[in-house]
Amino acid sequence: DKFAREAGMGFPGGPKIEKLAKGPELLDLPYSVKGMDMAFSGLMTAAKSKLDSGHSIETVTYSLQEHAFAMSCEVAERALAHTGKTELVLGGGVACNERLREMATIMTEERGVKCFIPSKDLCVDNGVMIGWLGHQMVSGNYEITDEDNRVHQKYRTDMVEVTWR
């Protein structure tokens, strides 16, 4: 979305970038992954610079998308390896992107782990995602005590007991 705004595409930028990302060549852009940390600021700045220097919007968006998703999949793969987890879930609006879905699916198949990608109508709205999770939890007879139903400052997603599968 940030690149799309700076390139004058407006909001939301993700779908517009995906539609344009058909460039014939992959430009050399910064790839910044350290452990499980990613930095996109240099990537965004370099992509805008490539656009400003005359590269086509299709080539720049293609290169930006490929780099950003390769970084994300690398970090996800590393997280799976370090934690021993056997499942990856994509979520949020970016999970609507077909290229990210493809890259995540390839990575998880190569690792022998499961990849869960909700239908696109469940990815575009945070309220819908939260509501769907609530539905799954209630349908799976998930119960929570008043004591557990409060804010936990250091709560981790891997602390959730998944009972609805």
Please give the residue ranges for each predicted region.
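Residues at alpha-helix caps and immediate loop-helix transition turns in enzyme cores, especially N-
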Residues: 43, 100, 127-130
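Buried hydrophobic packing segments
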Residues: 3-4, 76, 130-135
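A short helix-loop
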Residues: 1-55, 106, 136-154
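Glycine-rich phosphate-binding loops at beta-strand->alpha-helix junctions
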Residues: 85-104
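Adenine-nucleotide phosphate-binding core of ATP-dependent small-molecule kinases
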Residues: 35-41, 46-89
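Short glycine/serine/threonine/alanine-rich loop segments
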Residues: 9, 85, 113
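Glycine-rich phosphate-binding/hydrolytic loop that grips phosphoryl groups
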Residues: 118-162
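Conserved phosphate-binding/catalytic loops in two-lobed NTP-binding clefts
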Residues: 88, 105-129
